[in-house]
Structures are given as C-alpha cells and as structure tokens.
Amino acid sequence: MKKFLYTLLALLLIGLLTTYFILFTEWGNKIIASYIEKKINPNERYLSVKTFKLRFNSLDFKAQANDDSTLILKGDFSLLKQSVDLNYHIDIKNLRSFKDLIPYPLRGAIVTSGNIKGHRKALVIQGVSNVAQSHTAYNALLDDFKLSHLSLNAQDANLEDLLYLINRPAYANARVSLQADFNSLKPLEGHLILTANNALINNALINQIFHLNLKDTLVFNLSHSSDFKGNKAISDTTLTSPLVNFTALKSEYLFSILKLNAPYTLEIPHLAKLQNMINHPLKGSLTLKGDIEQSPKLLKVSGHSNLLDGALDFTLLNKDLKGRFSNISTLKALDLFHYPKFFQSIADVNLDYDLISKQGVLKANLKNAKFLKNSFSDFLYSISKFDITKEIYNDVNLVSQINQQRLLSNLSLKSPKTQLKIHNGLLDLNTKQMDMLMDAEILKFVFKMKLQGNMHQPKFSLILNEKAIQQNLQQGLKEILKNDSIKKGLDHLLKDDKLKEKLEKGLKGLF
C-alpha cells in the first residue's frame, strides 16, 4: 500500500513539475509558443511568437505577422483563478489579412491599445484607437471568450479613411461621428449610427461612377443608421444639400454577395442649379422615386416621376439608360429646357442612351399637336397666306440620332391640309445652331424650306425647284379652271384654231 502511495505521489510530483516546466519556464514557454504558431498557421506561416513569458502571476506576450502587424499583451495573469489584468497594444498594418476572422472585407491599418480585465465568464475590454484619424473609445464584454457586447464611440473620424476601411469608394470627405453597439461580430449583429456635417463631395469620383459633370463645390449633411442581423444590414440614409435631397429608407446590404438594394427618393428643388453639371439651363423642380441595386459588377437604378403633366420612368443599367416619357406636354418640356415655345402637343417619348459614348436614339410620337404663332408660322403665312397655327396634327413622328451634343433628326407631320417632313435635320445643342431642310406641302402648294442659324432665332428661306414650280402652276391652273366664267371664256377662245395653237405653245413653254 505504501508503495502504491509513493508511486502515486511520485507521478503527481512529476506531473506538477512537468506542468511547471512547460508553463512557467523559458524552455516550456518555447514549446507553448511553437504550439500557438502551429495552431494559428495551419497551412502557411503568417504569425510568429516573438516573446512568450508566462509566470505564476504574470504574462508577457508579443506576436508579429509577416506584414509587421504586432500584438502585445503584458500584465497580471492567474492560471489557477483564470483571471487577468492585462494591458494590450495592437498594430494592424492591413485588416484585409484578417478576412477569415471578420465576415466583412475590411482593409487599411488600425492601431489600438487598452486593458483586458476579469475572468473567463466576464472579461471586460476597454480601449482607445485612432481608426480613420479619429478619437475612438470602445468597451467589450466577453462571456466564455465569446463576445456578448461591444460599444464604440468615434469622434472626428475622416470619412475618406472610414469608407476605405469598409471597402467603399471615397464618395466624399468630412469629419464624422459614429456610435455602434454589437452583440456579435460573426455573424455581425448590432446597430450603428453615423452622422456627418458639412461634408464635401468628391466630384472626380462621382463624375466617373455616375457619368456626371460636377464642377462646383458641393457640401452636404449626412445621417445614417444600420441594423445588422443575419449576415445583412438594414439601413436608413438621409442626405441634404443646397442642390439635392436624398433619402434611402430600409435599404438592404447582403454581406455574402456584397449586394445593395435601396429604395430611394431624390428631390431637386431648383433644377436651375444643375446648369454647371449638365451644361444646359433648366427650370422648375424634380422628384424621383425608385430603387438602387449595386454589386461588384452591377449598378442598376430605376426611377419614376410625375412631371410635365405626364410621367417619366427610367432604368439605368451600368452605362445604359432607358427612359420613357408618357403623355407629357411638349410646351412644358420646351419651357423646362429654355427652348422657344413654338409647338404644343401631348407626347410619348422613348430614349436609349449610352452614358459613356454619349450616343443614343430618341423616338417620339405626338398627338393633338399644334404650331404656336412665331417666326416660323409668320414665314409660312407670308409665302402661302395660310395660317398653320389653326392646323391640328395627330400623326407626328420624330426619330433623333444622338451623338454627344448633336442630334440628327427625321420629323414628319401630317394634317388634312398640310404635310411637313425633315430628313437628317441637324441640331447642335452645344452651339445652339440648326441646319435643316424641310419638304412642305400646304394646300397642294409644294416647296422646300431651309431652317438655319441659332435655334432661338432661326432664319428661314424658300427653295422652289423646276418641278415644284410646274406642280404649283398646274395646280394654279386647275383652280382657275374651276371658275365657270373663266372656263366659258377659254372655251370660246379655243374655237379659234390660231388662238388655240398659240395657247398650246405657250403652255408647253411653261411645262
């Protein structure tokens, strides 16, 4: 019996000594350090333990990654009580290296330091950081080494750095404040609030992404909140500025496929302020409602607006814009674009446009169309004594080929008494110059008409070729012969063979 007890005590002593040598001696600490490295680096060597000193009541630990990221832990450590009071310093050179630990693709550098205190069931972490050049404080509570709560408060963070950190383009620059509370990091669960005042738009990037032409300095205020749950974020975003107001409520971002779906409302109170962006003056206001869908290879924006007494519906798919105007007033459209009010109608318009090449096709069908009194109607009256403003056109078709700022158009209008056609008429919106040839027929009077010069004050000229003159003379004679008195007189003259011969020769000379 004594032999058994001695053996048991010896084994226990050997076990204690072995545990002591492994845990609390330099030789044993090297074994533990090697084990930690193998556990962290199962396939390739990424992190190496530079210092590992574990004693009865203290710990001194330093690990370094291949990119020179470092982790330092130093302070009180009790293995028996399973309690710690450690100070830490973490310097991460690139968050992208931790993609296996964090479900969101973060990037950039971060430095943080603080204190870890407590025991296995209640471990409290308090720290500070300069993430995105901010003044950030955070608190975390771990239960059995699993995150049960994380709160974060960041002030004066640089928005460009923050957007870079979360792998988003630098749409703007500002100083922002951020408050966040999370109950889990994997999966991400919690709530976040972000605000920014007097933020400055990155014109170059916005122009590149949305194919715009921003020139002026644009300042805005931003309010954003997100709820994270089930590998997605549900967000509310409000942006206000002197130029535009934007709201996206209940937008959804799926982390697994990096996809955004956002219903939005866009308000532009004064379209005149867009002149420097689109190089053209506008009037009035605009409200758009629609949806935004964005993923790494897709940008889809759809929208609807009630305007010009009708409706606009459009879809932007990457660089391709398709728009439809339904039952709009052309008179209000001309007023919107500061064009001369020479024509009124109800129009349906379809637009296919490439935002990169700035080329496309515009097709329009007009009904209840009518010319208004202007220099064009005055010119037609001067040559035909016909008031075209009294005509109603229900068969009007327009097709325009768009190339940059130049429109090459085919236009046809038809009424019971008139017919007007333009083939390959040129309108340059940049120079405001036009060059068009119109084929016209008014009360059987056939002629060509040249429209040239400034679109706001064009010049008109009449062109009569030999065929047109013949047609008009023939029609004139037909109208003359409808007069009974003249017809009887001609019948009497034609009884004289000599006069008849002379008249025939004269008519042949005309035709």
In which residue ranges do the predicted regions lie?
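Terminal hydrophobic membrane-targeting helix
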Residues: 16-89, 93, 97, 118
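Transmembrane beta-strands of outer-membrane beta-barrel pores
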Residues: 92-94, 131-133, 156-158, 196-200, ...
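Amphipathic hydrophobic-ligand
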Residues: 45-47, 64-74, 101-114, 130-139, ...
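Acidic/polar residues at beta-strand termini and the immediately following turn/coil
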Residues: 78, 117, 143-144, 183, ...
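Extended terminal
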Residues: 1-13, 17, 42, 50, ...
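Transmembrane beta-strands of outer-membrane beta-barrel proteins
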Residues: 86, 125, 150, 190-192, ...
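A glycine-rich beta-turn/hairpin centered on an aromatic-Pro dipeptide
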Residues: 362-391, 397-399
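Flexible, solvent-exposed coil segments and beta strand-coil junctions
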Residues: 64, 92-96, 107, 117-121, ...
